Amino acid sequence: MSRGAVRAVFAVPGNIETPTGGYAYARRLIAAGREAGLLLDHWPLPEGFPETSLALLAETERRLSLAPEGWPVLIDGLACGALPPDLIARLPGPVIALCHHPLGLETGLRDDRAARLLEGEAAALEACAGVVTTSRATADLLVERLGVRRAAITVAPPGTDPAEPAHGSGGSAVEILSVGSLTPRKGHDLLIDALAPLAHLDWHLTIAGAGDRDPAFAAALEARIAAAGLGDRVTLVGAVGEAELDALDDRADLFALASR
Protein backbone atom coordinates (compact mmCIF):
# COMPACT_ATOMS: atom_id res chain seq x y z
CA MET A 1 0.00 0.00 0.00
CA SER A 2 1.37 3.43 -0.93
CA ARG A 3 1.90 6.19 1.63
CA GLY A 4 -0.85 8.23 -0.01
CA ALA A 5 -3.48 5.51 0.28
CA VAL A 6 -7.10 6.49 0.82
CA ARG A 7 -8.85 4.97 3.84
CA ALA A 8 -12.54 4.18 4.09
CA VAL A 9 -14.93 2.14 6.18
CA PHE A 10 -16.54 -0.89 4.52
CA ALA A 11 -19.59 -1.90 6.56
CA VAL A 12 -21.03 -5.35 5.87
CA PRO A 13 -23.89 -6.99 7.79
CA GLY A 14 -23.32 -10.47 9.17
CA ASN A 15 -20.25 -12.67 8.76
CA ILE A 16 -18.08 -11.63 5.81
CA GLU A 17 -16.62 -15.17 5.68
CA THR A 18 -20.03 -16.62 4.76
CA PRO A 19 -19.57 -18.69 1.57
CA THR A 20 -21.84 -16.76 -0.82
CA GLY A 21 -21.09 -14.78 -3.95
CA GLY A 22 -21.98 -11.48 -2.31
CA TYR A 23 -19.65 -11.99 0.63
CA ALA A 24 -16.92 -13.31 -1.68
CA TYR A 25 -17.22 -10.07 -3.67
CA ALA A 26 -16.79 -8.09 -0.45
CA ARG A 27 -13.67 -10.04 0.51
CA ARG A 28 -12.14 -9.59 -2.92
CA LEU A 29 -13.01 -5.89 -2.94
CA ILE A 30 -11.05 -5.41 0.27
CA ALA A 31 -8.05 -7.26 -1.19
CA ALA A 32 -8.18 -5.45 -4.54
CA GLY A 33 -8.59 -2.09 -2.85
CA ARG A 34 -5.45 -2.66 -0.81
CA GLU A 35 -3.47 -3.35 -3.99
CA ALA A 36 -4.87 -0.20 -5.62
CA GLY A 37 -4.14 2.10 -2.70
CA LEU A 38 -7.61 2.04 -1.15
CA LEU A 39 -7.55 0.66 2.38
CA LEU A 40 -11.04 -0.55 3.25
CA ASP A 41 -11.48 -1.11 6.99
CA HIS A 42 -14.04 -3.89 7.36
CA TRP A 43 -16.64 -3.03 10.00
CA PRO A 44 -19.24 -5.75 10.67
CA LEU A 45 -22.85 -4.67 11.06
CA PRO A 46 -25.54 -6.64 12.92
CA GLU A 47 -27.31 -9.50 11.19
CA GLY A 48 -30.98 -9.25 10.27
CA PHE A 49 -31.03 -6.88 7.31
CA PRO A 50 -33.02 -6.05 5.26
CA GLU A 51 -35.54 -6.59 8.08
CA THR A 52 -35.05 -3.83 10.64
CA SER A 53 -36.06 -2.89 14.16
CA LEU A 54 -35.43 0.16 16.32
CA ALA A 55 -32.75 -1.78 18.20
CA LEU A 56 -31.04 -2.93 14.98
CA LEU A 57 -31.00 0.58 13.53
CA ALA A 58 -29.74 2.09 16.78
CA GLU A 59 -26.86 -0.39 16.98
CA THR A 60 -26.03 0.14 13.31
CA GLU A 61 -25.90 3.92 13.77
CA ARG A 62 -23.78 3.54 16.89
CA ARG A 63 -21.20 1.50 15.01
CA LEU A 64 -21.14 3.67 11.89
CA SER A 65 -20.94 6.88 13.91
CA LEU A 66 -17.53 5.76 15.14
CA ALA A 67 -16.08 6.30 11.66
CA PRO A 68 -13.38 8.98 11.61
CA GLU A 69 -14.64 12.37 10.47
CA GLY A 70 -14.58 12.68 6.70
CA TRP A 71 -13.84 9.02 5.95
CA PRO A 72 -16.02 7.61 3.16
CA VAL A 73 -18.35 4.90 4.45
CA LEU A 74 -19.12 2.13 1.95
CA ILE A 75 -22.15 0.14 3.12
CA ASP A 76 -23.26 -3.16 1.63
CA GLY A 77 -26.67 -2.77 0.00
CA LEU A 78 -28.34 -5.44 2.11
CA ALA A 79 -28.06 -2.95 4.96
CA CYS A 80 -27.76 0.40 3.21
CA GLY A 81 -30.99 0.00 1.26
CA ALA A 82 -32.88 -0.52 4.51
CA LEU A 83 -31.46 2.48 6.37
CA PRO A 84 -33.57 5.60 6.95
CA PRO A 85 -32.26 8.62 5.00
CA ASP A 86 -31.96 10.70 8.18
CA LEU A 87 -29.66 8.07 9.72
CA ILE A 88 -27.45 8.19 6.62
CA ALA A 89 -27.37 12.00 6.79
CA ARG A 90 -26.15 11.92 10.41
CA LEU A 91 -23.06 9.82 9.68
CA PRO A 92 -19.70 11.63 9.88
CA GLY A 93 -18.55 10.92 6.32
CA PRO A 94 -19.98 10.53 2.82
CA VAL A 95 -21.93 7.29 2.42
CA ILE A 96 -21.59 5.10 -0.66
CA ALA A 97 -23.93 2.16 -1.20
CA LEU A 98 -22.77 -1.15 -2.68
CA CYS A 99 -25.79 -2.62 -4.46
CA HIS A 100 -25.80 -6.17 -5.81
CA HIS A 101 -29.55 -6.29 -6.53
CA PRO A 102 -32.45 -4.06 -5.47
CA LEU A 103 -33.97 -5.39 -2.25
CA GLY A 104 -37.55 -5.04 -3.46
CA LEU A 105 -36.91 -7.06 -6.63
CA GLU A 106 -36.05 -10.25 -4.76
CA THR A 107 -38.12 -13.12 -6.15
CA GLY A 108 -40.99 -14.36 -3.98
CA LEU A 109 -41.79 -11.17 -2.07
CA ARG A 110 -45.40 -10.12 -1.50
CA ASP A 111 -46.32 -7.12 -3.61
CA ASP A 112 -46.79 -4.84 -0.61
CA ARG A 113 -43.47 -5.89 0.92
CA ALA A 114 -41.67 -5.40 -2.40
CA ALA A 115 -43.17 -1.94 -2.81
CA ARG A 116 -42.08 -0.89 0.69
CA LEU A 117 -38.55 -2.14 0.12
CA LEU A 118 -38.26 -0.34 -3.22
CA GLU A 119 -39.59 2.90 -1.73
CA GLY A 120 -37.24 2.68 1.24
CA GLU A 121 -34.21 1.80 -0.86
CA ALA A 122 -34.89 4.65 -3.29
CA ALA A 123 -34.94 7.10 -0.37
CA ALA A 124 -31.78 5.59 1.14
CA LEU A 125 -29.84 5.74 -2.13
CA GLU A 126 -30.93 9.34 -2.70
CA ALA A 127 -29.30 10.19 0.62
CA CYS A 128 -26.00 8.56 -0.41
CA ALA A 129 -23.10 10.37 -2.05
CA GLY A 130 -22.75 7.60 -4.60
CA VAL A 131 -23.66 4.03 -5.51
CA VAL A 132 -21.48 1.12 -6.63
CA THR A 133 -23.18 -1.73 -8.50
CA THR A 134 -21.80 -5.11 -9.49
CA SER A 135 -23.31 -5.09 -13.00
CA ARG A 136 -24.66 -2.76 -15.66
CA ALA A 137 -27.98 -4.58 -15.41
CA THR A 138 -28.27 -3.61 -11.75
CA ALA A 139 -27.28 -0.04 -12.60
CA ASP A 140 -30.07 0.09 -15.18
CA LEU A 141 -32.59 -1.19 -12.61
CA LEU A 142 -31.56 1.46 -10.11
CA VAL A 143 -32.04 4.19 -12.70
CA GLU A 144 -35.32 2.86 -14.11
CA ARG A 145 -37.01 1.56 -10.96
CA LEU A 146 -35.53 3.60 -8.11
CA GLY A 147 -34.74 6.90 -9.80
CA VAL A 148 -31.02 6.88 -9.04
CA ARG A 149 -29.02 9.34 -11.16
CA ARG A 150 -26.83 7.44 -13.58
CA ALA A 151 -23.99 9.89 -12.94
CA ALA A 152 -24.01 8.79 -9.29
CA ILE A 153 -23.41 5.12 -10.17
CA THR A 154 -20.09 3.34 -10.60
CA VAL A 155 -20.20 -0.18 -12.07
CA ALA A 156 -17.59 -2.57 -10.65
CA PRO A 157 -18.28 -6.07 -12.05
CA PRO A 158 -16.57 -9.06 -10.44
CA GLY A 159 -13.73 -10.70 -12.29
CA THR A 160 -13.00 -14.34 -13.02
CA ASP A 161 -10.00 -16.18 -11.66
CA PRO A 162 -7.99 -18.09 -14.27
CA ALA A 163 -8.36 -21.85 -13.83
CA GLU A 164 -7.35 -25.06 -15.51
CA PRO A 165 -10.05 -26.87 -17.52
CA ALA A 166 -12.18 -29.14 -15.34
CA HIS A 167 -11.34 -32.84 -15.42
CA GLY A 168 -15.01 -33.82 -15.37
CA SER A 169 -16.62 -36.74 -13.63
CA GLY A 170 -15.04 -39.45 -15.73
CA GLY A 171 -18.12 -41.62 -15.27
CA SER A 172 -20.99 -42.68 -17.49
CA ALA A 173 -23.45 -40.29 -15.84
CA VAL A 174 -23.33 -36.61 -16.70
CA GLU A 175 -22.49 -34.71 -13.51
CA ILE A 176 -24.36 -31.39 -13.36
CA LEU A 177 -23.43 -28.68 -10.87
CA SER A 178 -25.59 -25.74 -9.79
CA VAL A 179 -24.44 -23.19 -7.21
CA GLY A 180 -26.57 -20.74 -5.27
CA SER A 181 -28.46 -20.37 -2.02
CA LEU A 182 -31.80 -22.17 -1.87
CA THR A 183 -33.96 -19.12 -2.53
CA PRO A 184 -36.60 -18.45 -5.20
CA ARG A 185 -34.39 -16.11 -7.25
CA LYS A 186 -31.78 -18.83 -7.82
CA GLY A 187 -34.37 -20.94 -9.64
CA HIS A 188 -33.38 -24.41 -8.46
CA ASP A 189 -37.07 -25.35 -8.61
CA LEU A 190 -37.07 -24.50 -12.32
CA LEU A 191 -34.01 -26.68 -12.79
CA ILE A 192 -35.70 -29.64 -11.09
CA ASP A 193 -38.77 -29.17 -13.29
CA ALA A 194 -36.55 -29.11 -16.39
CA LEU A 195 -34.64 -32.25 -15.41
CA ALA A 196 -37.63 -34.32 -14.26
CA PRO A 197 -38.70 -35.30 -17.83
CA LEU A 198 -35.11 -36.39 -18.51
CA ALA A 199 -35.03 -39.09 -15.86
CA HIS A 200 -34.52 -41.71 -18.57
CA LEU A 201 -31.08 -40.22 -19.24
CA ASP A 202 -28.01 -40.89 -17.10
CA TRP A 203 -27.28 -37.77 -15.05
CA HIS A 204 -26.75 -36.58 -11.50
CA LEU A 205 -27.25 -33.05 -10.14
CA THR A 206 -25.35 -31.51 -7.23
CA ILE A 207 -26.70 -28.26 -5.78
CA ALA A 208 -24.31 -26.30 -3.56
CA GLY A 209 -25.83 -23.48 -1.56
CA ALA A 210 -27.03 -22.49 1.89
CA GLY A 211 -30.50 -23.68 2.84
CA ASP A 212 -31.06 -21.30 5.74
CA ARG A 213 -31.78 -18.11 3.76
CA ASP A 214 -35.37 -19.17 3.04
CA PRO A 215 -36.13 -22.35 5.02
CA ALA A 216 -39.66 -22.63 3.62
CA PHE A 217 -38.39 -22.57 0.05
CA ALA A 218 -35.60 -25.02 0.87
CA ALA A 219 -38.13 -27.45 2.35
CA ALA A 220 -40.40 -27.04 -0.66
CA LEU A 221 -37.46 -27.74 -2.97
CA GLU A 222 -36.67 -30.97 -1.15
CA ALA A 223 -40.33 -31.98 -1.40
CA ARG A 224 -40.30 -31.14 -5.11
CA ILE A 225 -37.26 -33.36 -5.65
CA ALA A 226 -38.94 -36.24 -3.81
CA ALA A 227 -42.24 -35.81 -5.66
CA ALA A 228 -40.40 -35.98 -8.98
CA GLY A 229 -38.78 -39.25 -7.92
CA LEU A 230 -35.31 -37.70 -8.13
CA GLY A 231 -34.15 -38.35 -4.58
CA ASP A 232 -31.25 -40.50 -5.78
CA ARG A 233 -30.40 -38.18 -8.69
CA VAL A 234 -30.10 -34.86 -6.84
CA THR A 235 -27.73 -34.10 -3.95
CA LEU A 236 -28.03 -30.95 -1.84
CA VAL A 237 -24.64 -30.36 -0.23
CA GLY A 238 -25.41 -27.06 1.51
CA ALA A 239 -23.01 -24.14 1.75
CA VAL A 240 -19.43 -25.03 0.86
CA GLY A 241 -16.07 -23.29 1.18
CA GLU A 242 -13.85 -22.26 -1.70
CA ALA A 243 -11.74 -25.43 -1.71
CA GLU A 244 -14.79 -27.70 -1.76
CA LEU A 245 -16.43 -25.59 -4.46
CA ASP A 246 -13.29 -25.83 -6.58
CA ALA A 247 -13.41 -29.61 -6.20
CA LEU A 248 -17.08 -29.71 -7.23
CA ASP A 249 -16.28 -27.55 -10.26
CA ASP A 250 -13.46 -29.87 -11.26
CA ARG A 251 -15.68 -32.97 -11.10
CA ALA A 252 -18.60 -31.43 -13.00
CA ASP A 253 -19.37 -32.06 -16.66
CA LEU A 254 -22.01 -29.32 -16.93
CA PHE A 255 -22.82 -26.18 -14.97
CA ALA A 256 -26.48 -25.16 -14.72
CA LEU A 257 -27.62 -21.63 -13.86
CA ALA A 258 -31.40 -21.27 -13.56
CA SER A 259 -31.62 -17.89 -11.81
CA ARG A 260 -34.79 -15.93 -12.44
Task: Briefly describe each language-model feature range.
Residues T160, G168-K186, I192-P197, T206-A208:
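Conserved donor-binding/catalytic core segment of Leloir-type glycosyltransferases
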Residues P72-L74, I88-E106:
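Active-site proximal beta-strand in glycosyltransferases
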Residues L103, D112-V131:
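Membrane-proximal helix-turn-helix segments that form the acceptor-binding/catalytic region
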Residues A239-V240, A247-A252:
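Short alpha-helical donor nucleotide-sugar binding micro-motif in glycosyltransferases
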Residues G209, A218-A243:
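Nucleotide-activated donor-binding/catalytic signature segment of Leloir-type glycosyltransferases, i.e.
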